[in-house]
Structure formats: structure tokens, C-alpha cells
């Protein structure tokens, strides 16, 4: 049974992903509600190391990009999957969403860079 790790799994899209993947996969959710701080990259990487799919959903400024690079480095050359969750906020950035949108754009660009290396 494939093992899927999802950050930000307790609400919104994260909760929907848990519901969907739980049908056929073992799901591990990481969020503040169960004591995980995605800013602690080492703790997250310990949970992700033995899984098959990592869904990088939770937002915390730089942490999503740092997690992408850390998991990619750990999994390089292995048959594993990383899914990064972006946002429509990156299109037509509104003032109140600028910090969020900028970090999601950074994640998107980091994703493209990692994809080019595969």
C-alpha cells in the first residue's frame, strides 16, 4: 500500500486530499494540529523519508520551498513523487495577498527548477 504524507491536512484542500488518498493509500498528515511545525525541516523529512508520495500543501513563507529542495535532495534517483500545491492567488496579485502569492510563485519556480533536473 503506497504511503502518502500531506502537510496542512486538517482543512481545505489538505483535508480533501486526505479523504481521497485514504481510499487506497496509507496517509500521514502533518500539521500544527498534530504537533508538526513545517518550519522544522528535519522533523518533516524524517516522516517523509519512507513514504512514496509527498504532498507539499501547508503554507509557511519559506518552508514550502525549503521542504521541496530537502525532499528532492533526499529522494534524488528514487521512484517517488512530490506534489506541490500552488494557488490561484498568483494570478492577478491583490494587495492583501501579496506575501502569500509571492511565496507561492517562488514554490512554483522552485518546482520548475527541480523538474528540469529529472
Go through the PLM ranges and name each one.
Residues 53, 57-70, 102-103:
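Glycine-rich NAD(P)-binding loop of the Rossmann-fold in SDR/ketoreductase-type enzymes
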Residues 6-7, 55-57, 81-87:
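Structural signature of the Rossmann-like NAD(P)-dependent dehydrogenase/reductase core
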Residues 63, 76, 80-118:
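Catalytic loop of short-chain dehydrogenase/reductase
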Residues 45-56, 80:
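A glycine-rich helix->loop->beta "capping" turn
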Residues 4-20:
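N-terminal Rossmann NAD(P)H-binding glycine-rich loop of SDR-like oxidoreductase domains
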Residues 26-46, 59-66:
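Adenosine-cofactor binding site in Rossmann-like domains, unifying the SAM/SAH pocket
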Residues 4-6, 24-32, 107:
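Short, hydrophobic beta-strand segments that form beta-sheet elements in well-ordered domains
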Residues 11, 59-61, 88:
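Flexible cofactor-recognition loop at the NAD(P)H-binding site
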